[in-house]
Amino acid sequence: LNTFAVPEGAFTTLHVKAKDVDKYIELMKKNTAPFEAIGSDLAGVCVTKTGHQYPGEMFVWNAFPSVEKAFAATDLYDPMKASGPYKNMRKVKYSSTFKPLKEFNLQPAYERLWRLNLNNPMAYTQKMIELEEAIRAAGHNMNIGVFQPLGGGTEVFHVRAVSQSASELGKVVDDYFAGSSWSKIWDESAQYVDEIVSDTIEHCLSLIHI
């Protein structure tokens, strides 16, 4: 029995291979027209720091108040048809929409991302709610998100553990291996995971507040 309500809102992601990550981010900061065109509430980027599938791996994300708005955005801007500097700065890999399955405090920073095949998404999400509460009670400022792909092709569930610094992210891992009281919740959640598709660390930040 689920004891939580699925929140409103959705995110879109555009996964790219950037020729120069820093220059691409600066370009987006200066040219906000694509973000304004699709009507997102907030936009940003996540740059893969470890566990890359290819050099320059990153994605652009947009937050929307509903799945309706997120889906509608696909008709308002086509990244495959981008011209000018955007076309020259990155190669589009794929895009997706994600629905958060639990409340998620959006504070982009240093994030460990697991891409998972889940056999019981709602039961897993319940465990992540318990885990987040326990980790915070242990003194860590961590946000955990569980996101279901919608129209994402072969994309799988995304689970994000977010800390405000890379060292703090590592400190949580140290606590797990030291046998912290909350570690058993993480271990119990494994029964709902059929496969860990990938495990990466990303640096995420907000770019645009619309």
Residue ranges of each PLM-predicted region?
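Conserved small/polar residues in nucleotide/adenosyl-binding loops
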Residues: 208-210
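Surface-exposed interaction/gating patches
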Residues: 13-14, 100-145, 151, 158
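An N-terminus-focused feature that recognizes amino-terminal "leader" regions
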Residues: 11, 15, 24-28
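A short, glycine/Asx- and small/polar-enriched loop/turn
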Residues: 53-58, 153-157
